[in-house]
Amino acid sequence: MLNAQPSFTRTPTTLIALRWLATLHIIGGIGLAVTLWLPSLHPLILKTLYGTTPIDNPQQTLFWICIIGPTVASWGVLCRICVDYFAEQPSKRTYKRLILAMLVWAPLDTTMCLSHGIYIAGVLNASVVLLFWYLCHRLWLGQQQGLTR
């Protein structure tokens, strides 16, 4: 047993990337919440999210965008906890639950965003889904290879 280290130590890039993904959700979520009190950013946020689509009530829309921030930040914290747990004690059950969490969130969130003209969210969701799945899968494969050595 020369190679008794946990497999996640052999794939630090994957683990670091997953942790950064979680951290970016925390930072982004807090940033969204704070923008409610930064009116100079409101036009930029609305233009980024909606482009030229007319908005009936911009103040109400901004409130709902900003109130999502703490939720996104808390997801980042939960993601970090899950990723660290998965890295320390990898199991197929945990892997499946990480993927299930993504599958519950992504299709519904993306569909709602696209149906309301928030196309950038669809692009971001697709990017996060692909990256998160790839990194989790890579971590899982690394763990599986560690078991066979």
Model-assigned labels for residue ranges:
Residues 74-78, 91-111, 126-132:
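Hydrophobic alpha-helical membrane segments
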Residues 35, 54-84, 100-104:
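Core segments of alpha-helical transmembrane spans in multipass integral membrane proteins
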Residues 130-149:
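Membrane-water interface at the C-terminal end of transmembrane alpha helices
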Residues 17-24, 28, 68, 98-105, ...:
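Hydrophobic alpha-helical transmembrane segments of polytopic
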Residues 1-31:
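Cytosolic juxtamembrane helix and N-cap/initiation of the first transmembrane helix
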Residues 107-124, 140:
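Membrane-helix boundary connector in multi-pass membrane proteins
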Residues 23-63:
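Membrane-helix boundary elements
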